[in-house]
From Swiss-Prot:
GO CC terms in record: plasma membrane
Quaternary structure, from the entry: The complex may be composed of an ATP-binding protein (NosF), a transmembrane protein (NosY) and a solute-binding protein (NosD).
Lineage: Bacteria, Pseudomonadati, Pseudomonadota, Gammaproteobacteria, Pseudomonadales
Cited function: Required for the assembly of the copper chromophores of nitrous oxide reductase. Could be part of the ABC transporter complex NosDFY.
Subcellular location: Cell inner membrane
Membrane topology designation: Multi-pass membrane protein
Gene source species: Pseudomonas aeruginosa (strain ATCC 15692 / DSM 22644 / CIP 104116 / JCM 14847 / LMG 12228 / 1C / PRS 101 / PAO1)
Keywords of this entry: Cell inner membrane, Cell membrane, Membrane, Transmembrane, Transmembrane helix, Transport
Gene designation per UniProt: nosY
Main location: membrane
Listed GO MF terms: ABC-type transporter activity
InterPro entries from the UniProt entry: ABC2_NosY/YtrC-like (IPR032688)
Transmembrane segments: 20-40, 60-80, 111-131, 146-166, 179-199, 250-270
Name of the featured protein: Probable ABC transporter permease protein NosY
Amino acid sequence: MPVVWTIARKELADGLRNRWLLAISLLFALLSVGIAWFGAAAAGQVGFTSVPATVASLTSLATFLMPLIALLLAYDAIVGEEEGGTLLLLLTYPLGRGQLLLGKFLGHGLILALATLIGFGSAALAILALVPEVEAAILLGAFGRFMGSSLLLGCVFLALAYALSSRASEKSSAAGQALGLWFFFVLLFDLALLAILVLSQGHLSPRLLPWLLLLNPTDLYRLINLSGFDAAAAGGVVPLASDLPVSASALWLALALWAGAALALAHGLFRRRPI
């Protein structure tokens, strides 16, 4: 375990040196504070509206940003080390491939955790300080759920990035595959489900479609954050799952299983990768 933490600290130090942590934190802070105050500007209203509306808007934003940032952070974790000549050097030490992968996962996860806490937490603190009529318990509960699930979603895509990096032959290939993966889960998946729903002309059981959302971690993420709120705010196919007989804890478990399965896949691919 000390070896794993050594790798994790090295990745965190690289993130600090490369300004990844600073850039992600500033991006999250600026966008989240902007959405909290100007999210309803299109309707002619400027200022904080409500906790559900703010969380729904932030969830839509993070659905696009968090997977992309995680993929960009980790797509070259393996193939980049190999191209730089450091992977072979690292594996000459008493360090297993699983330990190396876990250390990178923890290090990159710490970068995302700190950026999420600093960036999105600043929006929560700003709302508490500037909007006295907001109930602190409701706000902190909603933002706590939002930040925790955002981090878990990021961990899913970190692990998927490791899987891509473990099978890619060069960094440019891994980058292209990472963007393709982001496009599929964030944009194409829901469009495909809507197309299937329309083209089936009622032949597809309406009970089946909501369960298909569990196959997409970004839809799981949206369901977690919109539980208890108006699911229609999510748009897309997520409102179809408003009557899904699954508890919030089961949704959390499903998203955690996504992260575990993706990390196991990455480990399997990395073990079979010739060095």
